[in-house]
């Protein structure tokens, strides 16, 4: 049942952030990013999206909330908004699905390719790839790969991984992935009767890995957990991009799923992130990162000349939406990142 929550927020303008003092400083050496909380995807019809994720992919709906008000407008950069947000869980990980009741945004372009810089997916770990693929086919999902691919043995960092790209009803890319015994977190190898186990990471296409590392590693404090260079017919058919040659960098924070950077060394013809993308467009996906002190994070983001979507730091006085302070920014390629203090 949908509930409407009264909103009591205030907006702290970015200019104010520059006046922050050492009283808000985090302990020395503590990363800004303490966890990746969720990936939030804008959808055109929340009921349809929730049905897909719960019925086909076995997510559990945790909450369904309707919100509106000036402070949300400042946070998301959309005037006159009213949003309905559902939070879903799979294993230990979460996603959020947001339908903008007003104003409606643009749909995802059918021409979106896996090497376009607006590409982002979540990687869902499965216990049995053959069973997962058969189930997805039975449910007539839209293909993004030509079929499941097994990455070749010559690629030591990825050998034996099986993966398949497909799309949800709105066109959001998704991946199912199965690790061989020598790869992936131990949690993915525990005995389980479940077919869909949880979310290992979200992957984003970037123009330049080193520039992205300055944001995710050097600014937010995420650590590099793995690197790989993938190419060949298996990678081409997984991404459905002829000649695909990728530099892949996996990043982790202390908890939650990882963030994976996908740089296409070839081909280099991927489209840039749309400069006019807005949070109510169905293309919108925001990675939600938890920080211990959003004010300190905001100050550092301003100092690093990060592009803000929010007009400033938004504070929720009663904490009913799960965080006290939050702001929405863009990474070097334009991918939205929500920084939130619980």
Q: What are these regions, as identified by a protein language model?
A:
Residues 1-8:
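N-terminal secretory signal peptides that target proteins for export/translocation
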Residues 42-93, 131, 138, 154-158, ...:
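Core segments of cupin and vicinal oxygen chelate
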Residues 24-31, 34-45, 84-97, 102, 108-197, 204, ...:
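Vicinal oxygen chelate
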Residues 10-23:
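Bacterial N-terminal signal peptides
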Residues 47, 51-67, 101-103, 110-118, ...:
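Extended intrinsically disordered, low-complexity coil regions enriched in Ser, Thr, Gly, Ala
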Residues 105-106, 172, 270, 335:
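Short, charged/polar, Gly/Pro-enriched secondary-structure boundary elements
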């Amino acid at each position: 049942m949908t509930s409407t929550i009264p909103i009591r927020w205030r907006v702290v303008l970015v200019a104010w952030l520059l006046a922050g003092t050492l009283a808000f400083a985090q302990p020395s050496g503590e990363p800004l990013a303490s966890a990746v909380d969720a990936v939030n995807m804008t959808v055109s019809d929340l009921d349809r999206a929730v049905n897909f994720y719960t019925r086909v992919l076995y997510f559990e709906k945790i909450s369904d909330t309707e919100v509106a008000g000036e402070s949300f407008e400042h946070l998301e950069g959309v005037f006159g908004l009213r949003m309905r947000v559902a939070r879903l869980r799979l294993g230990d990980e979460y996603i959020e699905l947001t339908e903008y009741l007003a104003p409606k945004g643009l749909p995802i372009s059918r021409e979106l390719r896996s090497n376009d810089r607006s590409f982002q997916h979540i990687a869902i770990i499965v216990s049995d790839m053959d069973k997962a693929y058969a189930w997805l086919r039975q449910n007539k999902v839209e293909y993004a790969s030509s079929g499941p691919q097994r990455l070749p043995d010559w690629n030591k960092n990825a050998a034996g991984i099986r993966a398949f790209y497909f799309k949800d009803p709105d066109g959001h890319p998704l991946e199912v992935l199965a690790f061989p015994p020598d790869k992936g977190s131990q949690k993915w190898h525990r005995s389980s009767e479940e077919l869909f186990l949880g979310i290992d990471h979200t992957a984003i296409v970037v123009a330049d890995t080193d520039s992205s590392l300055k944001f995710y590693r050097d600014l937010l404090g995420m650590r590099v957990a793995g690197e790989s260079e993938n190419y060949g017919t298996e990678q081409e058919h997984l991404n459905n991009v002829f000649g695909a040659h990728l530099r892949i960098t996996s990043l982790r924070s202390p908890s939650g799923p990882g963030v994976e950077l996908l740089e296409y060394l070839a081909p280099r013809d991927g489209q840039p992130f749309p400069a006019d993308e807005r949070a109510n467009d169905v293309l919108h996906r925001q990675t939600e990162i938890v920080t211990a002190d959003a004010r300190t994070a905001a100050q550092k983001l301003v100092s690093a000349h990060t592009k803000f979507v929010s007009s400033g730091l938004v504070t929720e006085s009663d904490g009913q939406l799960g965080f006290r302070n939050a702001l929405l920014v863009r990474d070097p390629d334009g991918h939205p990142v929500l920084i939130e203090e619980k």
